[in-house]
Curated annotation (Swiss-Prot):
Gene (UniProt): rpl23
Classification via NCBIfam families: PRK14548.1, uL23_arch
GO molecular function: rRNA binding; structural constituent of ribosome
Key words of the record: Ribonucleoprotein, Ribosomal protein, RNA-binding, rRNA-binding
Assembly mode: Part of the 50S ribosomal subunit. Contacts protein L29.
HAMAP family (alphabetical): Ribosomal_uL23_A, Ribosomal_uL23_B
Stored Pfam families: Ribosomal_L23
Stated name of the protein: Large ribosomal subunit protein uL23
Family annotation (InterPro entries): Nucleotide-bd_a/b_plait_sf, Ribosomal_uL23, Ribosomal_uL23-like, Ribosomal_uL23/eL15/eS24_sf, Ribosomal_uL23_CS
Length: 86
């Protein structure tokens, strides 16, 4: 899967802003067929950061979310600023 096909769009809300600031996490809507390995590789390719932990879930509306915790040497705030969401 192509990295742009895996990651659909960032989720921007008060909750995700808190996660960026306090837990060094980013939250994205991802393709429903994407695996955790696909998501890790896409994040590494698109944002040049290493993933420490990754959790996925499918919402009741049928969309798949990924909560991506970055390694300590990377800052989620900088990645979010480059995306224009922070």
């Amino acid at each position: 899967m192509d990295a742009f096909d895996v990651i659909k769009m960032p989720i921007i809300s008060e909750k995700t802003m808190k996660l960026i600031e306090e837990e060094n996490k980013l939250v994205f809507y991802i393709d429903k067929k994407a695996t955790k390995t696909d998501v890790k590789n896409a994040v590494k390719e698109l944002f040049d950061v290493e993933v420490k932990d990754l959790n996925t879930l499918i919402t009741p509306k049928g969309k798949k979310k990924a909560y991506i915790k970055l390694k300590d040497e990377y800052d989620a705030g900088e990645v979010a600023a480059n995306l224009g969401i922070y």
